[in-house]
Amino acid sequence: MPELPEVETSRRGIEPHLVGATILHAVVRNGRLRWPVSEEIYRLSDQPVLSVQRRAKYLLLELPEGWIIIHLGMSGSLRILPEELPPEKHDHVDLVMSNGKVLRYTDPRRFGAWLWTKELEGHNVLAHLGPEPLSDDFNGEYLHQKCEKKKTAIKPWLMDNKLVVGVGNIYASESLFAAGIHPDRLASSLSLAECELLARVIKAVLLRSIEQGGTTLKDFLQSDGKPGYFAQELQVYGRKGEPCRVCGTPIVATKHAQRATFYCRQCQK
């Protein structure tokens, strides 16, 4: 599933081609996504794009009359095409722009979303989200306060959008390794110093992944069709049985709630 770096990479890739241009019309070939594509999107016509923003894993296209909310789901990606090209099997939505470009949404598993809202504030998919991990609001003091009484393992707690948004399975595993914290540790057992370190490394890991265009494991592509290159720098995720790059101990993989967790027994306590 695309996580925060992949969504931010997509945002940065499409923004220069959309802002200042006008959506001439939308082409919806298959509106049966996670939720049905909003009727307003089918009717889009002559709508200038004012901004392209991100909140958590949602892309937000600001138009004069409202907002398009896009979620990439499990396998979605956005590409900028130089012109209208024949669609392939999983190309479900196009935005045809006044500058000749086309924003094309591809989603083999159709678990993404294209929604419309007049106002972002209070929209049900955005209403209960925690702070952005790259913002000043997310820091060690905040994390420690939220962990103090939490009797659950730290890894699933990091992946809870009410605590902090956008830290999915890949980056939770990588950040806990970088901080030397075992993923099964109770959140309440973390000291303030450990929370300060963890908050710092989460930011560093996410920023490094954004620099590398995100992580491509299967479906994700950048807006220019290239993969994300952070996969080459993964320390633990997807490396079961391979030697730890720090100590040489084989990487362990376990499963919790049907999500894979990767860690080093020696480096993470």
UniProtKB/Swiss-Prot annotation:
Annotated residues for binding of DNA: 90, 109, 150
SS bond list: none
EC number(s) from the headed UniProt entry: 3.2.2.23, 4.2.99.18
UniProt-recorded Gene Ontology molecular function terms: 8-oxo-7,8-dihydroguanine DNA N-glycosylase activity; class I DNA-(apurinic or apyrimidinic site) endonuclease activity; damaged DNA binding; zinc ion binding
The keyword tRNA-binding belongs to this UniProt entry's keyword annotation: no
Reaction it catalyzes: Hydrolysis of DNA containing ring-opened 7-methylguanine residues, releasing 2,6-diamino-4-hydroxy-5-(N-methyl)formamidopyrimidine; 2'-deoxyribonucleotide-(2'-deoxyribose 5'-phosphate)-2'-deoxyribonucleotide-DNA = a 3'-end 2'-deoxyribonucleotide-(2,3-dehydro-2,3-deoxyribose 5'-phosphate)-DNA + a 5'-end 5'-phospho-2'-deoxyribonucleoside-DNA + H(+)
Record-linked SMART domains: Fapy_DNA_glyco, H2TH
Signal sequence residues: none
Cofactor(s) the record lists: Zn(2+)
Cofactor detail note: Binds 1 zinc ion per subunit.
Keyword Lipid biosynthesis set for record: no
Family stated for the protein in its record: Belongs to the FPG family.
Known partners and oligomeric status: Monomer.
Protein name (Swiss-Prot/TrEMBL): Formamidopyrimidine-DNA glycosylase
